[in-house]
Amino acid sequence: MTVSENSVLETEVLVGGSAMPNERPGAMEPQSLTEMPEGFPRRSTVANGVRSRSSRRFFVVGGALLLSSFAIYEMGAVFSIGGITPLEYLVLLLFAINFCWIALAFCSGIAGFLILLRKPKAKDLEVTELHTRTAILMPTYNESPDRVFSAVSVMAEALSQTGHGHAFDWFILSDTTDPEIALLEEQAFLVLRQETHKHSRVYYRRRRKNVARKAGNVADFCRRWGSRYDHLLVLDADSLMESSTITGLAQRMQADPDAGLIQTIPSLINGTTLMARLQQFAARIYGPVIGTGLGWWVQKEGNFWGHNAIIRTEAFMGAAGLPNLKGKPPFGGHILSHDFVEAALIRRAGWSVVIAYDLPGSYEECPPSIVDLAVRDRRWCQGNLQHSRILPTKGLHWVSRLHLLTGIMAYLSSPFWLLLILTGLMLALQAHFIRPEYFTDQFSLFPTWPIMDSDRALRLFYITMGVLFGPKIFGVLLLLKDGQFARSVGGRIKAIFSVLFEVVLSALIAPIMMFIHCGAVMSILMGRDSGWSPQRRDDGSMPWLTLIYRHRWHMLAGVMLGYAAILDSLTLLAWMSPALIGLWFAVPISAWTGSVKIGEVFKRAGILATPEERSPAAICLQAQDARAAYQAHISKPWTLAQLLKDPALMELHLAMVDKQPLRAAGTPIEPVEAIVHVKVHEAQCQESAMALFNRQEMALVLANPLMLRSLQKLPEQFVAEDLVSFC
């Protein structure tokens, strides 16, 4: 169904009813981290409904510990021949930390590989009528409205055709602070309502103040409307989900009364730059190995990744209210990486948290460039390091603590790897420049030689590389074994070439990301907050001068490390060159990988192709077409001046403004709100008032009916006659 601009503007009432349903308030109290809440954990409804098999943990975690113990012993043996020096002890410690980290991923990969060898199918549930109600939430923050609303449009239409559409309501929960985007969202919502009101219930709400970011956005919905629904299916602004996946999640939740959260493993789609396509390919070829293995061994103690998951409302509201951490950001204040914590709290309360690794049809997008990845990772890094305050929480399952620790290590591993490189380099320089003390103060007939077991060291290097690249190797083996899978990415030969290209390019990018993560950790330790910047999702290109500024320290670090290596020998420089080349050429690598044009060249060549790119799902194609249509519908943004001039348009806008009560008289007032009140009160006309507003103030005015009514009472323009009469 198409909607012309005129038909939208001529509509004087909101098609499909109010922008939001009637509120049904419910409690969602912040949970204590120091005490176990009374009544937790709940008694399971089904016998063993939240019990996991310990044998799977023994295989993966026990295997990782055994493998790590062997590697650490071997590393100690490398140094022990000539006696271990303090610097060698430091190398051994750093090696132990880093190896344990990769060993867990390797053993998870083995489990995933063995499961995927059998080509498991999604668990078939008896198709029954859904008697539960699910709210599908799409939080958005300064995103392109055409992307968000077109995605909801196609998903809602597809879901309505399954016969289960009556069991779902759709909510676009906006935290947008850009006034122009906010008005575009309203235009897009009118189009969406015109398209869907006959078969779906779709709602829209923009918060006046985005307290606690995305977690606060969802919590606000829960406290005001959550009690109307049995489940919450949380999406992200770039999410897509097939109707069969949506209904499958709801049916699984309905069939398992002890399920608190079911997380899907999204596939990456719509990558246009080389960097995005690199991530898509890696996630598609190697990701299922890790994801399947993880879901297999964590069982009922899974994790939440913030979106593309269904949550039982009772479990979420009753157990996952987030407290504010003591102190100021970056370690205090609102919990940024809320998803891991919410999953841990839901499991603590006695509900199961499951990763549905067998359920396809879940999609998301990825950052288009190294710089965009760095911006996102800076925020995630702060949130994950904040989890160090959550680890001691009373009553958490040990697997939940391991999830939190794994998230922390995702970023701390970079400083540890860098320290390992630096200490190894120091060992080499020490052996080259510092004369060894062959005869110590203690009497001995034999000298003390600085000896290492080179054969054992080389063998350990091969083992470490095998563990590090093991999940990639497993993914490639599965690809080569499955002829249909291989054909879906262009055939085995092209797939092998793509894998080799991915390995080389990832190796060049890895040291850049290592230094980016090191910088993020350092800035957090120095007390700097990440803020909340909207994400770029399409073009990752930037001016070269901007990239030089962004990567200046990475290039300098590469030069310094290269100089230190060449002081020892050309051989050491050659060994370090895989890491150094990426740093030396950080700027062109960042520019080329963020280019849509270069990404298109590789797409035409069939390099880094994925099944989702070569044969997109129907929902993905429909979303692309719908987005183009929405771009045309909202090509002429509304303005505040138009709202003030057109009473019908103003009524449409006010119908979409959040109905949350305004500040009561005599209560504290926000500084920005006070400033706006003064500006409106002192303005002589609408034109002069609007000229005084900045973007933050404009967004506040758009969300405040009283201020809008006050502006409406002012004349459009100030004329000279008014001044004469005033005098």
Swiss-Prot record:
SUPFAM superfamilies found in the cross-reference section: Nucleotide-diphospho-sugar transferases (SSF53448)
GO biological process terms, semicolon-separated: glucan biosynthetic process
Pathway stated in the Swiss-Prot or TrEMBL entry: Glycan metabolism; osmoregulated periplasmic glucan (OPG) biosynthesis
Domain of life: Bacteria
EC code(s) of this entry: 2.4.1.-
Family, per entry: Belongs to the glycosyltransferase 2 family. OpgH subfamily.
PANTHER family: CELLULOSE SYNTHASE CATALYTIC SUBUNIT A [UDP-FORMING], GLUCANS BIOSYNTHESIS GLUCOSYLTRANSFERASE H
The protein's name: Glucans biosynthesis glucosyltransferase H
